[in-house]
C-alpha cells in the first residue's frame, strides 16, 4: 500500500515546493523506494496551456500530450520517471469533470457542492493509480490562506482521516526571514502560517524552513514549541548554489530520515547518493566554460525557459564545463546590429515561442550564425525562423514568412490542419479553440542515416515531445534543400519536417520538437551535449 506525503507552502509563494518535492522523491528513490509525485494546482484554468509565460512560466509537456505545470519538469529531472496527464490536476479540470457528471445525471439529482463533490473529485485524483508505488508525494500549489486552495486543503485533511493510520504525513514549507535591523531570523511568519494550517484541521508533521543563513538551535526549539512539531522535525532548508545541490543538502539535514521516521519505518534502507555527489562535483569543479546566447521573446522571466536552462546545464555536465547564458531580447535585433551582441558568444540558441513579436530578430540571429559559422540550435520556432531565413537569403524568396504572422504569399511556415497521432488522424481549424489544440506529446521522427543529427542520436528512429500549431511547409522542401538546408528528419509519413541542418556548417541544427523536455542531469539530452561540445570548439576560435 502506498504512503502519502502532502506538501503545503506558507508565508509567501515561490519558496520552492516543487524542488522540495522533487528532492525528497529523489532521496526516497536513493533508498530503493518507488515514488510518484503529483501536483494539485488551484487555478481555474483547465491547464496552463493558454496562460501567458509571464504569469505562469514554462508549460511542461508530457509524452502523452498533457500541458502541465513546470514543476513536473523538476519531478522528471530529479527522479527520471516520465510524468503523465494523471500527475497534474487543476481546479478548472476538476470543475469541468464535475459539471460533465452533473449534466449526465451522475449525481442522481443531488445538490452539487464543494463538499463533498469537489473534495471527493480531488481525493479520487490523489488516490487513483498508485498500486505500483511505495510513496506518493502531493504538492499543493499556492499558499495556505489562499481562497483558491481551500478545497484542496480540505480534501487532504479528509484523506488524513480516511487513509489507514500511519500512511499520511504532512510537510509544511515556510520562510524564516532575516531582519537586518534586528540582526536576527524571525519565527513569527512560520508560527502564523502553521496556525492558519491548523485552523483548517491539518497539523504538520514536519516543518521545512527556508532561510538564507543557519537557523540557531534556540529558534528551532521555539518553532518546535509553538508549532507543535518534534524538534528533529524542524528542518532548515538553506539556500544553495544550484537546484542539484538540494537533495544532498536535505539529506544532510535529515529530511528523508524524518519522513521515514514519521511513517514508522525503522530501520530504513541506506541511501545511495553517489549519483548526486557526482553531479554536484561536476557543477562545482568545471574544467572550462562557454557562453551561449539565448535569443528569445520572454527573456524577462527565466521561468518561461526553465527546462531549456536546465538542459543547457546538463550539456555542460556532459562536457565538464560551466555554461553561461547571455539572455538577449530578440526585438533588439530589429533596431540594432546583432554583431556586437553575438560576436563573442560560443553558440546561439533560438528557443520556442509564439507570435510575430521578435520574429525578425530571431531570423537575423539565424542569419548571423549561418554566415559566421557559429553553432546554432533552433528549437520549434527557432527552426521555423531558420527556414524562413534560408528561404529569403539563399533561395531568394523575399516575401518568405509564416502564416502565423498574417496572410502571406510565401508561407514557408504554415498552420498544420491534420496529422497522424498513432493510427488516428488529428484535425485542426484556424478558427478553433486555443486550449489543447496543438500537436502535443511524443511523436516519432525518422532521420537520414548520413545526417549529423542521426550521428548525434546514434539512431535513425527517435521519439520527441512536441508543442506547436505551425510547421515548415513541405512545398518548400526541394528549393530549400537545393540551397543547402538539409531536411534531415521527417515524420514517418514523410509529410512533416522535423529537423533541418547545414552540411557545410560546423553545427547548425533546427528541430521542430522540444528536446529540452527529456533531458536529465544523469542523462543529458544528446543534442544539448553535442551543442555544448560544438560551443567548446567555437570558444577556441573566438
UniProtKB/Swiss-Prot annotation:
Allosterically activated by GTP, when glutamine is the substrate; GTP has no effect on the reaction when ammonia is the substrate. The allosteric effector GTP functions by stabilizing the protein conformation that binds the tetrahedral intermediate(s) formed during glutamine hydrolysis. Inhibited by the product CTP, via allosteric rather than competitive inhibition. It is an enzyme of class 6 (ligase). Residues 291-541 form the Glutamine amidotransferase type-1 domain. Residues 1-265 are annotated as: Amidoligase domain. The active site is at residues 380, 514, 516. UTP binds at residues 13, 186-191, 222. CTP binds at residues 13, 146-148, 186-191, 222. HAMAP family: PyrG. PANTHER family: CTP SYNTHASE (PTHR11550), CTP SYNTHASE-RELATED (PTHR11550:SF0). CTPSs have evolved a hybrid strategy for distinguishing between UTP and CTP. The overlapping regions of the product feedback inhibitory and substrate sites recognize a common feature in both compounds, the triphosphate moiety. To differentiate isosteric substrate and product pyrimidine rings, an additional pocket far from the expected kinase/ligase catalytic site, specifically recognizes the cytosine and ribose portions of the product inhibitor. This is CTP synthase. It comes from Brucella canis (strain ATCC 23365 / NCTC 10854 / RM-666). The gene is pyrG.
Amino acid at each position: 500500500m502506498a504512503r502519502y506525503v502532502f506538501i503545503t507552502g506558507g508565508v509567501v509563494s515561490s519558496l520552492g515546493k516543487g524542488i522540495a518535492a522533487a528532492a525528497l522523491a529523489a532521496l526516497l528513490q536513493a533508498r530503493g523506494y518507488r515514488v510518484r509525485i503529483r501536483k494539485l494546482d488551484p487555478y481555474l484554468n483547465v491547464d496552463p496551456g493558454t496562460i501567458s509565460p509571464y504569469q505562469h512560466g514554462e508549460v511542461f509537456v508530457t509524452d502523452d500530450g498533457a500541458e502541465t505545470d513546470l514543476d513536473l519538469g523538476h519531478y522528471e529531472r530529479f527522479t527520471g520517471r516520465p510524468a503523465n496527464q494523471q500527475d497534474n490536476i487543476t481546479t478548472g479540470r476538476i470543475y469541468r469533470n464535475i459539471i460533465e457528471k452533473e449534466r449526465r445525471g451522475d449525481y442522481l439529482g443531488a445538490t452539487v457542492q464543494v463538499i463533498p463533490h469537489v473534495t471527493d473529485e480531488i481525493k479520487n485524483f490523489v488516490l487513483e493509480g498508485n498500486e505500483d508505488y511505495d510513496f506518493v508525494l502531493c504538492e499543493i500549489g499556492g499558499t495556505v490562506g489562499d481562497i483558491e486552495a481551500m478545497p484542496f486543503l480540505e480534501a487532504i485533511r479528509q484523506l488524513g482521516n480516511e487513509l489507514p493510520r500511519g500512511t499520511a504525513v504532512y510537510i509544511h514549507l515556510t520562510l524564516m526571514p532575516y531582519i537586518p535591523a534586528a540582526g536576527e531570523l524571525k519565527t513569527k511568519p512560520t508560527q502564523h502560517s502553521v496556525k492558519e494550517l491548523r485552523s483548517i484541521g491539518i497539523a504538520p508533521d514536519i516543518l521545512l524552513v527556508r532561510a538564507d543563513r543557519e537557523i540557531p538551535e534556540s529558534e528551532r526549539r521555539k518553532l518546535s514549541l509553538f508549532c507543535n512539531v518534534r524538534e528533529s522535525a524542524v528542518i532548515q532548508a538553506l539556500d544553495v548554489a544550484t537546484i542539484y545541490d538540494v537533495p544532498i543538502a536535505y539529506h544532510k539535514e535529515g529530511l528523508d530520515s524524518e519522513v521515514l521516521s514519521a511513517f514508522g519505518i525503522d530501520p530504513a534502507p541506506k541511501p545511495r547518493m553517489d549519483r548526486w555527489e557526482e553531479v554536484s562535483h561536476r557543477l562545482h569543479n568545471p574544467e572550462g566554460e562557454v557562453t551561449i546566447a539565448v535569443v528569445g521573446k520572454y527573456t524577462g522571466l527565466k521561468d518561461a525557459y526553465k527546462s531549456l536552462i536546465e538542459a543547457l546545464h546538463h550539456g555542460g555536465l556532459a562536457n565538464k564545463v560551466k555554461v553561461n547564458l547571455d539572455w538577449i531580447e530578440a526585438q533588439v535585433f530589429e533596431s540594432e546590429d546583432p554583431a556586437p551582441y553575438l560576436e563573442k558568444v560560443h553558440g546561439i540558441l533560438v528557443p520556442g515561442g509564439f507570435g510575430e513579436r521578435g520574429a525578425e530578430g530571431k531570423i537575423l540571429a539565424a542569419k548571423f550564425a549561418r554566415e559566421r559559422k557559429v553553432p546554432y540550435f533552433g528549437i520549434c520556432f527557432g527552426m521555423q525562423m531558420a527556414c524562413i531565413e534560408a528561404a529569403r537569403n539563399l533561395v531568394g524568396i523575399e516575401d518568405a514568412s509564416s502564416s502565423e504572422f498574417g496572410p502571406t504569399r510565401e508561407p514557408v511556415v504554415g498552420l498544420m490542419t491534420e496529422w497522424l497521432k498513432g493510427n488516428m488522424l488529428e484535425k485542426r481549424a484556424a478558427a478553433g479553440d486555443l486550449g489543447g489544440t496543438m500537436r502535443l506529446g511524443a511523436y516519432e521522427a525518422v532521420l537520414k542515416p548520413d545526417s549529423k543529427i542521426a550521428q548525434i542520436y546514434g539512431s535513425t528512429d527517435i521519439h520527441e515531445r512536441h508543442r506547436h500549431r505551425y510547421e515548415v511547409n513541405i512545398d518548400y522542401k526541394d528549393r530549400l534543400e537545393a540551397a543547402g538546408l538539409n531536411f534531415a528528419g521527417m515524420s514517418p509519413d514523410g509529410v512533416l519536417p522535423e529537423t533541418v541542418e547545414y552540411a557545410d556548417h560546423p553545427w547548425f541544427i533546427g528541430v521542430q520538437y522540444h528536446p529540452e523536455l527529456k533531458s536529465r542531469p544523469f542523462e543529458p539530452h544528446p543534442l544539448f551535449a553535442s551543442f555544448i561540445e560544438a560551443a567548446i570548439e567555437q570558444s577556441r576560435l573566438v
